[in-house]
Amino acid sequence: MYLVTAAEMGQLDRLASSEYMIPSIVLMENAGLRVVESIERHFQGQVANRRILIFCGKGNNGGDGLVVARHLLNRGAEVKVFLLARPEDIRGDARTNLEIYQKMGGKLLLLLGESHLQRADIALLYADLVVDAIFGTGFKGAAMGLPAAVINMINKAHRETVAVDLPSGLEADTGRCFGPCIQATWTVTFALPKLGLVVEPGASLTGRLEVADIGIPQKLVATQHFNRRLLTAAWCRSQLPRREASGHKGLYGRVLAVGGSPGLTGAITLAATAALKAGAGLVTAAVPRGVQGILAMKTTEIMTMSLPETPAGALSRDALDPLLERLAEVDVLAIGPGLSRDPATVDLVKELLPRVQVPAVVDADALNALATDTRVLTGDHGPLVLTPHPGEMARLLGTTAAKIQEDRLEIAAKYAREWQAVLLLKGARTVIAWPDGQVYINPTGNPGMATAGSGDVLTGIIAGLAGQGLKPGVAAALGAYLHGAAGDEAARQRGQRAMMAGDLLDFLPYVLRNLEEEVETIVAAGLGRD
């Protein structure tokens, strides 16, 4: 599902009118009707006699709200419109809908100053629902003055609130909120989701997101060159590797997982197990000689490979040649889980990666090794999938995690191009950037997954998918979705607070089966179905 900026959405609206002769007032009517239908579903078809307050600004978003008011009035709801502007200041299609609403006898109350707030505050005490139609996609900066006071008043009332297109006070392009912003119960956005609705903090303010068709021709959408997508179950289902009836384990990918060190054998075990559970045919865990026995006792299905080690028990520079020999026999490399930051291991990583020709999924201490010399990334290398969390990304760039979080999408996209690697930036709403400029945002996952070993599971899933022949970017995007969906299922069945990385392994097969069989149990947090 494409994600758009305010400018891109505005261009679609204009082209729908200029090239397809769809009047803008028709788009406004369709938008308002979709919100009304959503409200009807919310109340299970019973909107008659519901006390619904609609707060309208003076722009087109307010016009959408006036369409909502008209149709709810026709359906028997007790509607009050609070207008944050003088009627004579309303223009265009919004003015037309205001006049229709007034001719229908609808209640219109003006909010022109703080002295008018008391009546709205009292009405909120008895409201069944609030409709937020104050600001639209053109809003930038911070809500101030009267609009800010109204937004704060609505939030303090703690009434169920549906936002029209996006919560007022939220920037459509960035998801940032520099002043008060509506905390919506759910949001009905039009045609395509706006970027700011699916990245934090916007995603948390949006509530459940519904994407409504307002009649913009799909033929028109197909002519546009949008490079950002929201991952959906439908897209992920279409990317699943096929399992042939005549298939064998060699056909489904040979994965070499390199990592482990004293005290950190769990990380490489999780990654290797995840690769198998993601569908890989054969997985070998290559670890320091001193921990091979521990790993062999931990696992049954995973093969192990013993490698030379340093006096501290980490992988030594002498592991390079054995690894290169084994890499000639596998389809994908996963490197980093539990690897350690031993100086000899750091040197090993920097010498190994430029010589790897198969796709390599690079995580954890392998990323920390690259942070000591990023020339490995800017030089010649094979296909790479880098999977940093914000702290690891900050080390790669010599900055802070806070700076990374301020501009996650742009940073991921920039360095995916610069390093010619797939860059998966972990966090709430994980970003997957491809070297060609495409960016995917993953809606699955929850805070319970912020636990030791979760990233190791993700590394293994991606490697397992890449081993089955998926391109690195597809493997990373699909892997992120499956990883988060497994976490969501674990949260539903076991709760978030006590979640462990092993729970993700338990529920990954369940998620894969349901996705493959098109069972609609995978619903991304905050989103409706595809």
Curated annotation (Swiss-Prot):
Q: How is the cofactor bound?
A: Binds 1 potassium ion per subunit.
Chain spans, region NADPHX 1 = 60-64, 136-142
Domain YjeF N-terminal: from-to ranges: 9-222
Q: Which cofactor does it need?
A: K(+)
- The record's region (NADPHX 2) falls at 389-395
| Residues reported in the UniProt entry to bind K(+) | N61, D132, S168
Residue positions annotated to bind (6S)-NADPHX 1 are D165
Q: Which SUPFAM superfamilies match?
A: Ribokinase-like (SSF53613), YjeF N-terminal domain-like (SSF64153)
Name the EC number(s): 4.2.1.136, 5.1.99.6
Named from the GO MF annotations, one term is: ATP binding
> Where is ADP annotated to bind?
426-430, 446-455
Alphabetical list of InterPro entries matching this protein: Carbohydrate_kinase_pred_CS, CARKD, Nnr, Ribokinase-like, YjeF_N_dom, YjeF_N_dom_sf
Biological process (GO) annotations held by this record are:
metabolite repair; nicotinamide nucleotide metabolic process
Keyword annotations of the record: ATP-binding, Isomerase, Lyase, Metal-binding, Multifunctional enzyme, NAD, NADP, Nucleotide-binding, Potassium
Q: Where is this region: ADP-dependent (S)-NAD(P)H-hydrate dehydratase?
A: 232-530
Q: Which reaction does it catalyse?
A: (6S)-NADHX + ADP = AMP + phosphate + NADH + H(+); (6S)-NADPHX + ADP = AMP + phosphate + NADPH + H(+); (6R)-NADHX = (6S)-NADHX; (6R)-NADPHX = (6S)-NADPHX
Taxonomically, the superkingdom here is Bacteria
Role noted for this protein: Bifunctional enzyme that catalyzes the epimerization of the S- and R-forms of NAD(P)HX and the dehydration of the S-form of NAD(P)HX at the expense of ADP, which is converted to AMP. This allows the repair of both epimers of NAD(P)HX, a damaged form of NAD(P)H that is a result of enzymatic or heat-dependent hydration.
Similarity comment text for this entry: In the N-terminal section; belongs to the NnrE/AIBP family.
Q: What is this protein called?
A: Bifunctional NAD(P)H-hydrate repair enzyme Nnr
The organism named in the record is Moorella thermoacetica (strain ATCC 39073 / JCM 9320)
